[in-house]
Each structure stands twice: as structure tokens, then as C-alpha cells.
Amino acid sequence: MTSIINNTNSTVFDSTNNGNMAILEPVQPVSKGPKGITFSGQTFVVPETHDMVKTLFDPTVRKSNFELIILGCLFSNLLVFLIPNNQIRIYIFIALYIFWRLSYNFGIGWLLQNQSNHNLLVSWSQKYKLFEPGNTSFLAKSIQNEIKSQRGENYDIKSMPVEFNTWLIFRKFVDLILMSDFITFCCVVYCSAIKNNYQFFNNQSSWLVYSRIVFGTGLILFNLWVKVNAHNTIKDYAWYWGDFFFRQINNEELIFDGVFEMVPHPMYSVGYVGYYGFALIAKSYVVLAIAIFGHFLQMIFLHYIENPHIDKIYGPSKNEINLIKILKLKDLKNFDNLKPLVGLTNFNWMRASDIVNLVLSLTYGIIIPLFANSIKSLFILTVGMKLFESISINLLLTLQSYFKVVTKWSLSNDIPVEKSLSNWAVLYNSLINLTYSSLFGMNLGYFLQKSSSSSSSSSSSGLLFSDWFYLRIFLGLLLVYTQFWINFSIIDSIGYFGWFYGDFFIPKSQSSIKNITTAGVYRYLNNPEQIFGVCGVMGIFMIYPTVENFICVGLWVVNNFIRINFIEKSHMVKLYGEQEVNRDSGVTKTVKKHLLPEVIQRRMSNDEAYARTNGISNGRRKSSNNSHSNSVADSLDNFIRDLRNSSTKLSQQKLIELSQNLSFANSDYKLTIDGLMQSTEGELKYTTIGTPVTISWTSPEKNHSVRDWVGLYKIVQTSYSRNKTILSSAGRWTWCKEANGTFIFDREKLFWEEGVYEFRYHLDGKHEVAYISEPFEIKSVELDVPAIEEYANEFAENLKLEIFDKVINLTNINEAISPIANQSDNVIEVYKLISSMISKSTKINITYKIFLNHDLLSIKDVAIKLINIKHVLEELSFNITTDKKDI
């Protein structure tokens, strides 16, 4: 389920109307209630709906035909209890649960994915005319009767959009599957709990039984609160995936309020802790296994169905994505333009430090434990490595924060500050790897020694506790996974710059980082690594609860606490200020808002205001990339998008037929293209990428409309229809206000890629075609790269004339490219376009990163780079040839 928040204003554009604002007519009289708008631009008032529990189980709410069927299906589960054998009942309910769970995650998932990408459900409704009053088919009558029974006899089906009516029917399938899924799970819980003469409260001490029941009930109640709070926040619209069918006006951004401010995707994460509470109460590994199974499938559903749709509808704009890309690319500039090694992630065989890290990790994690004589020696090694890492890293960070010792040393030795951060990253990661490798090696040694023992009783010797082995394994692995997930979430939020304490080493004026982040995992927690950053060590202790592991947990926790609260925090306050550092996290806000009495909330607010006035600070974690706001992504017609992405090739015969314009031989309308070149007779005329194209049109005076227009299209996308254009021109068009005239298509009006194109003359603001021009080709210009730098100026002038002048306005070949290119709304695309044009024109491949790595790069510098690249490539080619001759 997606989450939404109110926004102020929204403007809807018709993607098939050349960027002009569509006039949206409401389909019913204006009344109170939220306003909806379909993806085709039809507006309506969204009627009130109820949640599934109220709809199905509240006797005061009218039951529809489908709802009565759903209730019958739910109560039919009781028939299984007529079977006397409880184990058979468990098998049946597990099979039913698996069926409904797969129906949820793969059935509903498939429908939603196709609805999001292809408008499938709405297309079905339109294809079979399910909501047409005159349709007398059994399916249509059943569907219409269902809606009438839901909404009442006075509900006018025809007055509401097909999208909304389809959503009403889709909701009933959701009700059936979700309620059946939950009911069958509860049946599994009950049958498992009463197994073996009510085993859930037998064979355990009373305090442990009560603890399980109390803690399990707490998880279930917390789960219930999460669901209720989430529904109160996002309402039925998002609960039933309404934004897959239509949008609510002024509800166009993701919400981060209530439970959505506590954890990411609460409906899929903490929204399933109640399942584990049921497993705890039932004291059943069977229940735990199916709870894990269901939760795992739900995370798959989130990743492959929910998140892609959220990104499409609520994701960042192109400019915001562009900014994020720039920041991430500039983040790598501090690490030699390669992703640095984090643990053993981003491993590169061509990087010496990575090889050393791998060798050390294997040595301390595997080789030493294989030859160690005792656990004690491995324990001493692990403690020694952790103490060495803690003291050295904490000392260096403190000295760098207060005295800039690393920066001063680097500058005194003519080493750039960026290089000092890269060197620090290698040192920091190497020491962290050594500590975790030693910890892993200690536990591997323990396992090897215990497994080699012949006495079965010795297998649990040395453990602080040995019960609940499988539960310990599950919880331990879960904690280890959580630490990995938190670490990668931190890197995703603050980048490698933040992960390696970049603001300790790089001056703020030279960094793209200006503010502390409030995005990603930092939206919910100020210091996620303070607890979760070491929970993997706690997980290892749960799997092997030895005294040695317990001491290691203490070392990791104490070091983490000192580093964050006494080193990082003070540096952040000094760098970013107390007010910036002192903000409440999402969890803190939610606890204050929902779990603390109002009197205490007011008292805390007053205390915080007083603290800010008097300079009292709590502090928070390191810096990161600027947080970005999510904006509404434009909804595109998927059929048109398929055409746009078409890679169909036209045959030469087809091109000849198109060039003859047989369909418009006797037309009073004409389109001609001026300035095209032709290499040989019979070949298509062509122009070069970025060159302005001038067209002239002629139309009859008496039939001419000021809303006539001309658009530019790829032939491979429009050859399907010669009389009507079914594809948007994407802004590449112009009005024909006069009966005869000319227009120059340039810059954003052009296609910037090779291919065959045509112009189309359309009538009266519509898409009926009156004339199609002859096809023409857009090619890359051919530029020869000189062999020596003496001709760099001449070559640079050619680059400026044939490539750069078509994209950006530079006065001369020595002017820096970056300041001018950065004025563009999408600088990454500008750099990619220039690099692509250069690569195709010179036959020397370069990437857009050369423009990012050198802020003062000029056209002449680019020319020199190309000359040098050509020189190196020719030398390598010559050497290869020479070697072959010598052989």
C-alpha cells in the first residue's frame, strides 16, 4: 500500500496534446469529498468507502453480493475442524495459507504490475464494456449488480469513471484474498498451539509461558496499532492501491507521518511482527516458518510491485534525479572515481588495497583458526584487534577534528585533500575488516573444536544457555542481516563521503555536502548505527552464547557509543550547528505524538525551546547528500511508450514507399524541408545531429485553421498509421498560424540521435494527418582527430562549430564548459549528449565523466585529450602489429 500526503496545487497535462494544458471537465456535480482524477484527465468526486473489517463484519453496513460470498468462504474454513486428526488439519490449513499467500503476492501482484504498466484491469473493463448500461452479458450484469449492492440503487455507474468502478471490483478480490490469508494463518496458529495436548503452555516453567504470552500479545497489539495507524493515515485510497487506478487531487506526495515516520514501509516491515507474536504464543516452529515465508514473500511484493510504482508516481523529478546523480558521481571523485571498498563490497581485482584486504580477511577469519591451539588465543587476538581498531580510529578522528593533523600532513607533502580521504578510507575499512574477520575466526575456531569433540554433552559446554537452538539461529541471522541492511541504507543515504567521515577531511567549501541529511534511514533514526551498527555482533552471540562473544558484544557496543556520542557528535555540532543537529528523528516524533500524554509533550516542547535558547545540544550523526523532495512523476500512456521505445527497422522498399508520399499525392497541403544534403542519388537526404531544420508548409486558405500544427516524428514509430498520429510529439511541434509559412526546428525541437524522421501536418489541433513530408536521415558529423597537438586549436574550433555550439553557448574554445553547462536543467544529459556526439563523430569513445572531473575543462582541453587518446591507441595498435611481425 502506498502512502500519500496533501499538496497545495496540481496541474494536469495531456501527454497526447503536445504539452498543452487539457481542459478537465468534472463528470458529476461538485460536492464534498476528495477529488479524484484519472490518468486520462477525467475528474470526479471520490465517494466514501470503508475498510475491509468494517465492510465485512460490521452488521450496520450493507453487505454486497461479493461480500456475502467472501463471508461464506471465510466461515467455510470451520469445516476443516470437523476432521478429528489435528495434524491433518494443520497440513490443510498450511496448504490453504500458502495458496492465499501466493494469490496475494503473485496474483494481486501480477494484476497490480500490469495495471501500473499497461492499465490492464481498466482495459479489461473497457474491452468487455462491464459498466455499460446496455450490456446484457452475464459478466457485465453481475459486475453492475455488485456495484449497485455496494453503493446502493441510487449510485449512477455511468457517471463515474471506469477506473473508479474497476477499483471497486478489485477491492473485493483484495478483501477475499487478504482476509482468507489471515484467517487460515490464525487457524494454523490455533491448531499448532493445541497440538500434543495444548503444548503451547505445557513442558515449560510457568514464568516462561507467561512471558511468551505477554510478549507475543504485545507484538500482536503493536502490529494492530501499526495497521490502524497506517489506515488512519493513508485511508482506503492507498490501502487498496487506489493510485494504481486514479489519483487524488492535492494528494500527490508520499506521506511521512504517524507510523510512516517511524520505519520505512511499515505495512511490510513492522506490520508483520504480529505474525512472530503468534508463533511465540503457539510455541511452534511451524508457525514461525510460515510467518517467515509470508513475510519474505511480502518483501518480494514490496520490491517488485510496490516500489517501482511508488517511484513512477511519487518519485523525484528529472532535475532531482539529475542532482542525485551528480552528487553521487562527485562523491566518487574523492575515491579515485571508483566505489571504495566497504567490507569486501565493491571489490576490485585491479586495486592493490582490495587484494590486501582479502588476504588479511582470509588469514584472520579462516587460516589462523584452522591452526589455532585454543579458543583463548583466538579470543585474545579478537580483543586485541578490536582495541587496536578502537583506539587508533578514535584517536585519529579526534586529532583530525581538533587539529587537522591528517590534512596538514597531506598538504605539506603536496598530496591533495581528496587523496587524504581516499587513504583514510583504506585504513578505516582495513581495520574494520580485521576486527570482524577476527570475530568470525574466533567463532569458527569454537565450532571446529566443539565439532571435533566425541562427547555429545560437550557440544553445549561453554555456552551461557543452550535452549531454543533453532530460534537462536533465526534471531541471530536476522540481527546479522539487519546490520548489513542498515549499513547499506546508511551508505545509500549519506554516500561513501559520509560513511568514511568525509566531513572530517574535506573542507565544507570544497564539498558538495552542505547540510545534515534527513533522507533515507536518517528520516527515522538520527543515529541508526548506534544500535543497529553492532547488532550483527549481538546476533553472533545469540547463535553462540559464549562468554567470549558476550565480552566482544560489550567491546563493540562501548566503542560504538564512544565514537558516536563523544567524537562524531561534537564534530557535527561544531560543523553544522546545534539547531541543525538537534532535530527529532521520526521515531522520536511518533513516540511523542502517539505514546506520550499531551501534558508531557507540552513540557518537553517547552524544555526544548529553553534548551535551544540557552545553547544546550543533543547532537546527531554525520553529513550527507542534500535530502531531496519527491515530486509527482508524470503518468504516461503505456501503449504510446511502447511505440516510443520501438526499435523496429524499416526496409529500404518501405522507405521508398514512404518517400513517394502516395497517400497524399493529390493533397492541397504541402510540406518541404530546406537545406538537406544528399551524398548520392537514390540515397535518403540527410542532415547532421543538432543542425537546425527549416520546414515550409502550404495549405488552402479557405480550409486553414490557426490550430493546424506540424510535428516531428521517428518513422519507425509512426509508420503504423499514415492518416492519424497516435504518438505524442513530445514537444517537437509548432503551430501553423498562417496558411503559408516556415519554421526552424532546433535544440529541444529536434531529435538528438541518429535515425530516419518525417514531419507531419495535422489539422485543427487534432491528430488527423493532412500531409507527411519526405523522410530524411539524421547522421553524426564526421571529424578527423589530428595526430599531433599542433593542430589542437583548429580541431577545437571544429568541435565547437559542429558539436558544442549546437548544445551550449560558449564564446571561445578556451572558455570553461562547466559553468555554462550547469545552467541547463539537466546537466548530466547535456554532458552525455556532448560525449555521445564526440564519440560518434571522432570514433573515439569518451564518457561524460571527463566533464565532471575537471570544473575548468575547455573545448581546447577536450581536443587535446582526444589527440592524446588517439596517440596512445595508435601506439598500442602499432606495438601489437610489431609484436606479431616479430613473432
Swiss-Prot record:
Is the Zinc keyword given for this protein? no
Q: Which residues lie on this side of the membrane: Lumenal?
A: 1-63, 113-173, 227-261, 306-354, 399-423, 494-530
Which pathway is it part of? Phospholipid metabolism; phosphatidylcholine biosynthesis
A Pfam family matched in the record:
PEMT
Task: Give the first-level EC class, as a single word.
Answer: transferase
Entry-linked PROSITE patterns: S5A_REDUCTASE (PS50244), SAM_CHO2 (PS51598)
Q: Where in the cell is it found?
A: Endoplasmic reticulum membrane
Which ranges make up the Cytoplasmic topological domains here? 85-91, 195-205, 283-284, 376-377, 445-472, 552-887
Which InterPro entries does the UniProt entry name for this protein?
A: Phopholipid_MeTrfase, Phosphatid-EA_MeTrfase_fun
Q: Which domain of life is it from?
A: Eukaryota
Chief localisation class:
endoplasmic reticulum
- Membrane-protein topology: Multi-pass membrane protein
Q: Which GO terms describe its cellular component?
A: endoplasmic reticulum membrane
E.C. numbers: 2.1.1.17
Which spans are transmembrane here? Answer: 64-84, 92-112, 174-194, 206-226, 262-282, 285-305, 355-375, 378-398, 424-444, 473-493, 531-551
MF (Gene Ontology) = phosphatidylethanolamine N-methyltransferase activity
Q: Which UniProt keywords apply?
A: Endoplasmic reticulum, Lipid biosynthesis, Lipid metabolism, Membrane, Methyltransferase, Phospholipid biosynthesis, Phospholipid metabolism, S-adenosyl-L-methionine, Transferase, Transmembrane, Transmembrane helix
The Low complexity compositionally biased stretches are 614-631
- The SS bond pairs are none
Outline the segment boundaries, as ranges, of region: Disordered.
610-631
Gene3D superfamilies (UniProt xref): 1.20.120.1630, 2.60.40.2840
Q: GO annotations under biological process?
A: methylation; phosphatidylcholine biosynthetic process
Q: Which family does it belong to?
A: Belongs to the class VI-like SAM-binding methyltransferase superfamily. CHO2 family.
Q: Write out the function statement from the record.
A: Catalyzes the first step of the methylation pathway of phosphatidylcholine biosynthesis, the SAM-dependent methylation of phosphatidylethanolamine (PE) to phosphatidylmonomethylethanolamine (PMME).
Designated name of the protein: Phosphatidylethanolamine N-methyltransferase
Species this chain originates from:
Candida dubliniensis (strain CD36 / ATCC MYA-646 / CBS 7987 / NCPF 3949 / NRRL Y-17841)
